[in-house]
Amino acid sequence: MVSIWTIALFLLGAAKAKEVCYEQIGCFSDAEPWAGTAIRPLKVLPWSPERIGTRFLLYTNKNPNNFQTLLPSDPSTIEASNFQTDKKTRFIIHGFIDKGEENWLLDMCKNMFKVEEVNCICVDWKKGSQTSYTQAANNVRVVGAQVAQMLSMLSANYSYSPSQVQLIGHSLGAHVAGEAGSRTPGLGRITGLDPVEASFQGTPEEVRLDPTDADFVDVIHTDAAPLIPFLGFGTSQQMGHLDFFPNGGEEMPGCKKNALSQIVDLDGIWEGTRDFVACNHLRSYKYYSESILNPDGFASYPCASYRAFESNKCFPCPDQGCPQMGHYADKFAVKTSDETQKYFLNTGDSSNFARWRYGVSITLSGKRATGQAKVALFGSKGNTHQFNIFKGILKPGSTHSNEFDAKLDVGTIEKVKFLWNNNVVNPTFPKVGAAKITVQKGEEKTVHSFCSESTVREDVLLTLTPC
């Protein structure tokens, strides 16, 4: 039996398509695949550039606090600005119900200025994003065309190569970047920060962000649970050459605080309120921004699933290495292999989000006991707290392995401290030791070994030195 919904879609598709044309950026239709489909049932045309009012706000190392407005139709605005044609350009494009002057965009620019000289352009299309979702999703096409127009102007008037450009788009902004990239041959890079699911997941590549939109496309997924029933705003669909799923890509640590503590945020009431409404979705740009200042703090591991990653089946990095999620993903040697690549990692629950993964194996000695075996690493750059490696029967001669994510890179490991404990009192006061502990950092092939012939009672530290 044909459903009423199917009939309605048929009638929508059968209606004559409409089209609007705008000077310098072309024509836009509401024909398939843009409308009249199961994913995009409503026929909605994008607004005009004048109504959307897109602005290009330039920040540079010379003007990190006050923007200069650039116009894609007026090259003189480039000449009158601090735009440097010998430096890279990174555009940051916001998403639904957001704006180009929101703090997070400028904060991201300022982090860039700490590590490089760069043109940082915040794309403000708030008039086109602060409307109904369906309308905003269609306005994406015009905003993307305007970004492409800006890139074309830079190329035509200043011989500025698109290969020098990165488009960073959050939410709907990721698909704005995709539209711009599809119109700009040779675009260097697009980074999608939790590309939005609704109206885009499952659509043809021409509608959404995809790997053909730039020479390199990387995507960070932080809110990939289904929109219905879990209210996940981001897509689970792989849309880049490298797709990163931190913490599994659905539930970010630190996002399940109670309402009051979430709203009364360290970054202010407004940012806290945003976090309360869409914490997982917003984590993507927070991870990216922090990655700029942590070149090696977001190493990501190829894995079939997050469950496999959490089961310690994807460690250490393969021979080709591991990419860094975020700003330095483009340094990965095999970033544009033919197959889309899926990567996993864990982050912290609040700033600082960076983590360094270690694999540890313990060979026990001493008496048989029940309890937990823990290890802390001490290195040239600092030390970790105690991590639980094994819980159960501590049997001499047995070897137990685990992985953990440390808050810092300890540097060259100089010693390891072993501790065991049990909440149940043992009247025999057994002594347990670690005859050997091996440690490997995820991105390195070297396995470091530490030994001791001693044993200790419960809650007494045992120091192991290189052997």
Curated annotation (Swiss-Prot):
<keyword id="KW-1015">Disulfide bond</keyword>
<keyword id="KW-0732">Signal</keyword>
<feature type="domain" description="PLAT">
    <location>
        <begin position="356"/>
        <end position="467"/>
    </location>
</feature>
<feature type="disulfide bond">
    <location>
        <begin position="255"/>
        <end position="279"/>
    </location>
</feature>
<feature type="disulfide bond">
    <location>
        <begin position="21"/>
        <end position="27"/>
    </location>
</feature>
<feature type="signal peptide">
    <location>
        <begin position="1"/>
        <end position="17"/>
    </location>
</feature>
<dbReference type="Pfam" id="PF01477">
    <property type="entry name" value="PLAT"/>
</dbReference>
<dbReference type="InterPro" id="IPR000734">
    <property type="entry name" value="TAG_lipase"/>
</dbReference>
<feature type="binding site">
    <location>
        <position position="213"/>
    </location>
    <ligand>
        <name>Ca(2+)</name>
    </ligand>
</feature>
<feature type="disulfide bond">
    <location>
        <begin position="109"/>
        <end position="120"/>
    </location>
</feature>
<feature type="active site" description="Nucleophile">
    <location>
        <position position="171"/>
    </location>
</feature>
<feature type="active site" description="Charge relay system">
    <location>
        <position position="194"/>
    </location>
</feature>
<dbReference type="InterPro" id="IPR013818">
    <property type="entry name" value="Lipase"/>
</dbReference>
<dbReference type="Pfam" id="PF00151">
    <property type="entry name" value="Lipase"/>
</dbReference>
<dbReference type="GO" id="GO:0016042">
    <property type="term" value="P:lipid catabolic process"/>
</dbReference>
<keyword id="KW-0443">Lipid metabolism</keyword>
<keyword id="KW-0325">Glycoprotein</keyword>
<comment type="similarity">
    <text>Belongs to the AB hydrolase superfamily. Lipase family.</text>
</comment>
<feature type="active site" description="Charge relay system">
    <location>
        <position position="281"/>
    </location>
</feature>
<feature type="disulfide bond">
    <location>
        <begin position="303"/>
        <end position="314"/>
    </location>
</feature>
<keyword id="KW-0442">Lipid degradation</keyword>
<dbReference type="InterPro" id="IPR016272">
    <property type="entry name" value="Lipase_LIPH"/>
</dbReference>
<dbReference type="InterPro" id="IPR036392">
    <property type="entry name" value="PLAT/LH2_dom_sf"/>
</dbReference>
<feature type="glycosylation site" description="N-linked (GlcNAc...) asparagine">
    <location>
        <position position="157"/>
    </location>
</feature>
<protein>
    <recommendedName>
        <fullName>Inactive pancreatic lipase-related protein 1</fullName>
    </recommendedName>
</protein>
<dbReference type="GO" id="GO:0005509">
    <property type="term" value="F:calcium ion binding"/>
</dbReference>
<dbReference type="GO" id="GO:0052689">
    <property type="term" value="F:carboxylic ester hydrolase activity"/>
</dbReference>
<keyword id="KW-0106">Calcium</keyword>
<dbReference type="InterPro" id="IPR029058">
    <property type="entry name" value="AB_hydrolase_fold"/>
</dbReference>
<dbReference type="InterPro" id="IPR002331">
    <property type="entry name" value="Lipase_panc"/>
</dbReference>
<dbReference type="InterPro" id="IPR033906">
    <property type="entry name" value="Lipase_N"/>
</dbReference>
<feature type="binding site">
    <location>
        <position position="205"/>
    </location>
    <ligand>
        <name>Ca(2+)</name>
    </ligand>
</feature>
<dbReference type="GO" id="GO:0005576">
    <property type="term" value="C:extracellular region"/>
</dbReference>
<comment type="function">
    <text>May function as inhibitor of dietary triglyceride digestion. Lacks detectable lipase activity towards triglycerides, diglycerides, phosphatidylcholine, galactolipids or cholesterol esters (in vitro).</text>
</comment>
<feature type="binding site">
    <location>
        <position position="208"/>
    </location>
    <ligand>
        <name>Ca(2+)</name>
    </ligand>
</feature>
<feature type="disulfide bond">
    <location>
        <begin position="451"/>
        <end position="467"/>
    </location>
</feature>
<keyword id="KW-0964">Secreted</keyword>
<dbReference type="InterPro" id="IPR001024">
    <property type="entry name" value="PLAT/LH2_dom"/>
</dbReference>
<feature type="disulfide bond">
    <location>
        <begin position="317"/>
        <end position="322"/>
    </location>
</feature>
<keyword id="KW-0479">Metal-binding</keyword>
<feature type="binding site">
    <location>
        <position position="210"/>
    </location>
    <ligand>
        <name>Ca(2+)</name>
    </ligand>
</feature>
